[in-house]
Amino acid sequence: MNKAFIVVAVVLLILGIISFNLVFIILAIISLFFVDPQIMRKFYKFFLKSNISKIFVKNYKTNHSIVIEDGYLKIEDNVKAFLIVDDIPFDYRDLSDESLRVKISSFHKVLDIAGQIDIVFRKSSIDKNKFLSDLFQKAQNIRVIIDADPSNERAKNELMMIQHMIKKISEGEMPFKYLIFFIINSDSKEKALATADVVKKGLESIGVKSRLAYKHEIEDLLNDKLSLKKIVFPSQIPFLSVFSLQKQPDYEIITDGIYLGQEINDRRAVFWNVNRVINPHALIIGPTGSGKTEFLLSLGVKTNILYGIPIVFFDVKKDISLRLKKYGYKYKYINPLLNSINLLKFSNVNKDIYLIQLENIIRNSFKLDRFVSALLYRILLESISDNYYEVSWDYIIDKIEKYDINEDVKAYLLRIVSAIKSLDAGVEDIDLISAISEGINVVDLSSIKSEELRRLVMYGIIIKFINKYNIADDRLKLVLVIDEAWTLLRSEDRDYQIVADLIKRGRGFGIGIFMATQNFDDLGELSDIFLENIGLLGFMNNGDKKFWNEVMRFADLNIEETLRSLIFLGKGEMLIRFINDPRPIMIKTDVLVRNSF
């Protein structure tokens, strides 16, 4: 019986080598196993050491047209895309049991996208003492950097990470080198690479950075010549621990730029990279006492320090200037009662376009109806056409008085223009726009008691800067900061947009706008435009369930998490969401303290 199996095994082996058919080889091995398991083991060693295996593999590759390029391998109609893991910047031990249970399915959901997927994990140990020595040296170098520049938040964050790694080693967790491949199977190159891209983005959402493998990396994997370079701890490998982390926005957006604060769950530093987003605007919504003004102040000051661009605060309650003094920051004080906006003077823009802008400013400031607004536009047009170089509000008042219109309408227009005249002196040598410095500027609106005139000042400054910086580039040149933004946003409608148009244009005007208000109703009828186009959207603590139900339209939240966590956010804690990415983050905001820079 044994001889029969040996004869069969030899015949099958010969057929397999001649025809390059793997089925015959497998059957031969099975036949040998029935004869004697030791024979099979000896044959396996012989097969691997001999040239037979090399000849077989070589001919199999030739016979089946294997193609290896960056990102994929093709064998006839079977295509495999290769993703390689670059970084796993987290630790699951920072999560609570409940958070871990909630997030456990995310990793598997990402893998389910690909249908059939293989994971290759290679691991090797490292010299712990040498690794520790390198960490101590790096920590020492970073401390020198921080001593020279105490405002360097990125260096502080890196030092914190190194100290955390040293602590892990001291607790007995051994680091190791690793390499991880995700292999996606498909029937075409296009489908394989497209699926790999979707998986890559899904992995990024749980904090895992990956990329398509290069051709030589795929070849090294197949030839078992891979060199392991990345170093991690056991608690950083989610695939072996069967868990996932919370979804996070694009890695490049939250790891560089303006320091916003620490993530509440894992205390990781969160940044806002204004240069990487398509829209440099921010809107913070929260009730009185939630900490939105402090955060807005911090955001504006940090933007000026980090990017070196002018920041203009509109100070409605005089609390901005008081807080800046309290924290020891120098700023330029600008009083619109002393520095004129010069609304009747314009440059860098066509006359007809500016007249439309001026009509929009006055219409939105005084909430004029269509008839009165159209009549005012006609009067402005005739006044400037009659007296282009010397037009004044007095001239326009005379024009209105001579106009053959309804007396009530005439009185209404005279009241509006007289109010504008009282504020807009039109003296060029004290021009408000020219008074704006390159640093921090505070426009004091607290001395203006009329909401209409406050809006006039803010709208006038916005339009003047839009015309000044209306150059086709993506560079951020100025940021306007508006606390109590409801004063502007409620007055806009779909036909006469100023702030909404600025926000929709993204970086187009070169102007960023940071705003804070108390609730969704403050945004007026254009609320969807503001919420859908804002680059950084923040929601602060609010016990109203209706409020959080509205938030769920713009952020990817589940009901349980909302009820258990968000309603009980403390002062200075906030849920943030970046544009075009519904994945939210809960942070403890970083605010100014005296000499914080």
Curated annotation (Swiss-Prot):
<feature type="binding site">
    <location>
        <begin position="286"/>
        <end position="293"/>
    </location>
    <ligand>
        <name>ATP</name>
    </ligand>
</feature>
<keyword id="KW-0472">Membrane</keyword>
<dbReference type="InterPro" id="IPR003593">
    <property type="entry name" value="AAA+_ATPase"/>
</dbReference>
<keyword id="KW-0813">Transport</keyword>
<feature type="transmembrane region" description="Helical">
    <location>
        <begin position="10"/>
        <end position="30"/>
    </location>
</feature>
<comment type="function">
    <text>Part of the Ced system, which is involved in DNA import.</text>
</comment>
<dbReference type="InterPro" id="IPR053657">
    <property type="entry name" value="Ced-DNA_import"/>
</dbReference>
<dbReference type="GO" id="GO:0016887">
    <property type="term" value="F:ATP hydrolysis activity"/>
</dbReference>
<dbReference type="GO" id="GO:0005886">
    <property type="term" value="C:plasma membrane"/>
</dbReference>
<dbReference type="GO" id="GO:0005524">
    <property type="term" value="F:ATP binding"/>
</dbReference>
<keyword id="KW-1003">Cell membrane</keyword>
<dbReference type="InterPro" id="IPR051162">
    <property type="entry name" value="T4SS_component"/>
</dbReference>
<keyword id="KW-0547">Nucleotide-binding</keyword>
<keyword id="KW-0812">Transmembrane</keyword>
<protein>
    <recommendedName>
        <fullName>DNA import protein CedB</fullName>
    </recommendedName>
</protein>
<keyword id="KW-0067">ATP-binding</keyword>
<dbReference type="Pfam" id="PF12846">
    <property type="entry name" value="AAA_10"/>
</dbReference>
<dbReference type="InterPro" id="IPR027417">
    <property type="entry name" value="P-loop_NTPase"/>
</dbReference>
<keyword id="KW-1133">Transmembrane helix</keyword>
